[in-house]
Amino acid sequence: MSKPVALITGASRGLGAELAKSLSSTYHIIAVARTIGALEELDDQIKKRGGSSTLAPIDLINTNAVAQLCRSIFDRWGKVRLWAHTAIHAAPLGPVITMDSKDWEKSITNNVTVLAKLIPMVSPLLQEDSKAIFFEDTTIMKKFSSVYGATKAAQIQIVKTWQDECKSTGPKIYIAQPNPMPTAVRARFYPGENRKELQSIEKEAKKLVSLLKL
């Protein structure tokens, strides 16, 4: 397979899916998500564009499954040119004094612990000229966002630290902040928002590919 490999964790919908489609003209896509049906739909759309993908329907919480995936990637392709992590758990908005412990624990697991385990497992697949991209979301860092905001901030701090550590050696680590888009996460937070006023997910994905020269 002549195309370089792009690993998209959280590829079943939203920005992850649109990035996968936008990148499929120049990359072989490894699409990771829990939802098999959504991954199969993504695969169909990529094929219609003349691209190719490998589907990995796994839960990122499952460390053994992720380790097996990384080993399989190494055995087949040897390296990953691009890693985009878009997977996120969005706990409901609410006052700090009513924080639910289950929402907190699930958010810590999915948004912080998963990333803390992913980076050590994926990084051996990344070379000096590889790229990894993560996504900031300060548009929701306001009141009532304590659980989501805290875990998202922790996630980004991990990435910033890794970014500093890789400045002289590679890979290149990017932290991007797309404009507000009509994603399922945003709809959960702002159900009454006029989604027509938000930026197209497809356009934001294409803009990221262009700006970051992915």
Model-derived regions: residue spans:
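Conserved glycine-rich Rossmann-like NAD(P)H-binding loop of the short-chain dehydrogenase/reductase
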Residues: 26-41
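Rossmann-fold cofactor-recognition segment
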Residues: 48-63
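Catalytic loop of short-chain dehydrogenase/reductase
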Residues: 88-89, 116, 124, 129-168, ...
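Catalytic Tyr-X3-Lys loop
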Residues: 97-116, 133, 155
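C-terminal helical subdomain
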Residues: 168-171, 175-177, 183, 191-214
